[in-house]
Amino acid sequence: MLQWIKKLSLTPIYLAFILIWAYFAVYAGSLLAYLGLGVLLLRLFLTYPFKKSLAALAFLSLFVLFFLLRREMAEQAIRQEPPSASSVQVLPDTIKVNGDSLSFRGRTDGRLYQVFYKIKSASEKEAFQQLTDLVVLAIEGEFEQAQQQRNFSGFDYQAYLKSQGIYRTLKINKIQSLRPISSLNPLDWLSVWRRKALVYIRNNFPSPMSHYMTGLLFGDLDTEFAEMSDLYSSLGIIHLFALSGMQVGFFLDGFRRILLRLGMKRETVNALQLPFSFIYAGLTGFSVSVVRSLVQKLLAQQGLTRLDNFALTLMVLFIIMPNFLLTAGGVLSCAYAFLISMMDFEKLPPIRKLLAESLTISLGILPILIYYFSEF
């Protein structure tokens, strides 16, 4: 991809900026997005030679066609009524038990659903809390539409599920049987490994240590954490539970350092980092912030830095996680990465550098926080 961009004689960040406007024009369909995209394309043809502009437009059109295809597939999935549910495969690392309420993500007929069930007994609750295997439930249930936004600035649960590739919820009325299964899908393996680790930590470590471990290592915050979130916020440590590029860099650098000290060639280590990154992303639930950090780290090892690195990261994410900018978490993660890529305070004294970086990030992210949460 980078070689194609170099042939266009355009900076990658400029193409990425146009792609962001095209992305929101396709997915949001707002007048502002169309207007911004039109202005940028007009400037493209006015600034660069016609042939280069045409080549850039062809390159951008490939992404736009991909966006349109994904949007149409999503719209078809929303319109199409699913058949009646008789069984559902449980993704074990998504299991959440809150009182007598059970929720998880499940797969049936090749589609992903958010599943809800009212637990009937204490033994059933304990069984699901300790469940770590891949299972299929024989059920009686019905599909429903997720709740939309009910008030101004309220949470739009339906839009959130749509951004996760989920277009219906499944309400289970009765579980008839539970059957363990095996799978050849690596994503299922990662789900099982992650679930086993989460259950082990919660069974063997006290609170709040277990919260730290599941949050920092696996990106999972359970219902017990929600009850303590106000306390953590008042102590000023709530941010410690969010996986960030710092943790990703720590694990990747550690993995790389160990292999190099074992005498492996640098080329071999670079190749092994790809499957390691995939496994690590799976163990953290493929969160946008982790995947974005991993992609940036891998590109940095290929010599791409700062804005070129950020631009190529966006383009890769557009392909592997097309919905990443449809959530507040995705927007915030990329905004932080952009601000860090833009900052250059190396010539300042240490204290002034720290203050300048903190102020730049805080002010830069403020409009996004106000837009999504009406607070900061």
Describe the residue ranges of each PLM region.
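Short linear sequence motifs
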Residues: A16, Y27, F59-L60, V97, ...
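N-terminal leader/targeting segments
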Residues: M1-R79, T169, R292, L317
